[in-house]
């Protein structure tokens, strides 16, 4: 079954971004990518996305700063924050879900699916 949902993935680590894109596109999602917060905001403003998945550590803006600005622009779009930290990062109240890096792909896709269905 093909999903018609568009997901914006933001990460400055090319390998992590490529892996996330592979998992999501294999599940039928259309995936857009950005390597930093400024590029992500440009895409977010110009294209309708159904979900944003961002890393916490990004150049120029943190993932939580990016999430806060995105929620200000389009509050209904769910935002997932990826973090290598065990505890939730400061500012994560602007996100709908915090996931730790290294989550198994099946669990990752289940959580993404639940957020998109809301």
List each language-model region with its residue ranges.
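Short amphipathic alpha-helix used as the core "switch/output" element in two-component signaling
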Residues: 42, 64-75
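Receiver (REC) domain active-site loop signature in two-component systems and cognate sites
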Residues: 58
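Acidic, metal-coordinating helix/loop segments flanking the phosphotransfer/catalytic sites
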Residues: 33-51
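Conserved acidic segment of CheY-like receiver
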Residues: 4-15, 20-24, 52
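Non-catalytic signal-transmission and effector/linker regions of two-component phosphorelay proteins
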Residues: 1-6, 104-118
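Acidic catalytic/metal-coordinating carboxylates
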Residues: 36, 62-65
């Amino acid at each position: 079954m093909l999903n018609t949902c568009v997901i914006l993935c933001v990460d400055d680590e090319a390998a992590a971004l490529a892996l996330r894109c592979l998992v999501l596109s294999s599940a039928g999602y259309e995936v857009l990518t950005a390597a930093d917060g400024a590029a992500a905001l440009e895409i977010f403003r110009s294209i309708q996305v159904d979900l944003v998945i961002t890393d916490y550590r990004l150049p120029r803006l943190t993932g939580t700063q990016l999430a806060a600005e995105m929620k200000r622009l389009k509050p209904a779009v769910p935002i997932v924050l990826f973090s290598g930290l065990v505890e939730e990062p400061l500012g994560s109240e602007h996100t709908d879900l915090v996931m730790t890096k290294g989550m198994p792909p099946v669990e990752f896709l289940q959580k993404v699916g639940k957020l998109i269905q809301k």
